[in-house]
Structures are given as C-alpha cells and as structure tokens.
C-alpha cells in the first residue's frame, strides 16, 4: 500500500494553517516537503509524516510557543520518537520549561510527574500523538466522503 501525498493546499487545509505558513516553514527548513519540484509550475507534495509534523508545529504554535521554541520542540520530538507518524501510535509526551537551562524539556508523559510539575506551578504542554492522528484522520475522512459524493474540493 502506497503512502498518501498531499499538495500544499491539501496539507494547509488538513492542518489548519495558511499556505504562507507552509512556505515560511519550508524556507526555514522546519518541515521540508518530501517531493519538491523545480522550475516554473513546480509541484510540492507532503507525505503523511510531513503532515503529522505540520500538525505538531501548528499545535505548538497554537499553545503560545514562539516559532523558535516550536521548531526546536518539533525537532526534538521527531528525534525522540521514530514512530511519531505511525497512525497507531498512542504515545504521549509533555514539554515543560527548565528554568535553569531556560529551555523546553521533552519527556514521555508520566501522570504523576505531570501532576507534580503542575503542583509546583510549572506549565506543561501535552502532546498526545493519538489526538493529532485522529484530527488528521477526521479531516481525511471528510475529504474522501466529499470526493466520493462528487463534490469538487478545489
């Protein structure tokens, strides 16, 4: 079974970001599309794993992280979890601030540790990969149903 690919427009719709954001993230090499054409009329396609990265980046920005923090966080998560794009992944992570290092720390979610951090007044950012995959699947299912019904999506 082949991997699904998304045009820039489809990826932006799926993730809930603008085409300009995708272009900026591409220019900054935060999320680089799998297939990039060259020349006039070039086509850019994002793989399923690229779209998962886009969704994670969008989420990190939506919770108030700066672009630099979100970019570092995404990179750290992708390096820490080689199965982040697996649609069956149920892994849970949290980011929290390390005051001494003045940076975000990524850890696998542990309920007791998360509660202890909250009890200390520490903010945490949960990353539930399962929820991200569900969001992407819901959008994909809607698109498929509309296409099957003969609705032109472009």
Where is each model-derived feature located?
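Basic Lys/Arg-rich amphipathic helical interaction modules
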Residues: 1-2, 58-154
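Basic helix-turn-helix/winged-helix DNA-binding cores
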Residues: 1-53, 59-65
């Amino acid at each position: 079974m082949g991997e699904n690919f998304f045009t820039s427009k489809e990826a932006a719709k799926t993730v809930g970001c603008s085409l300009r954001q995708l272009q900026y993230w591409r220019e900054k090499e935060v999320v680089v599309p799998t297939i990039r054409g060259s020349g006039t009329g070039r086509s850019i396609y994002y793989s399923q794993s690229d779209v998962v990265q886009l969704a994670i980046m969008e989420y990190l920005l939506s919770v108030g992280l700066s672009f630099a923090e979100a970019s570092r966080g995404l990179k750290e998560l992708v390096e820490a979890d080689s199965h982040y794009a697996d649609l069956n992944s149920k892994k849970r992570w949290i980011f929290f601030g390390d005051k001494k290092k003045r940076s975000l720390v990524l850890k696998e979610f542990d309920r007791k540790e998360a509660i202890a951090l909250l009890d200390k007044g520490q903010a945490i950012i949960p990353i539930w990969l399962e929820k991200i995959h569900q969001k992407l699947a819901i959008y994909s299912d809607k698109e498929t149903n509309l296409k099957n019904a003969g609705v032109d999506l472009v």
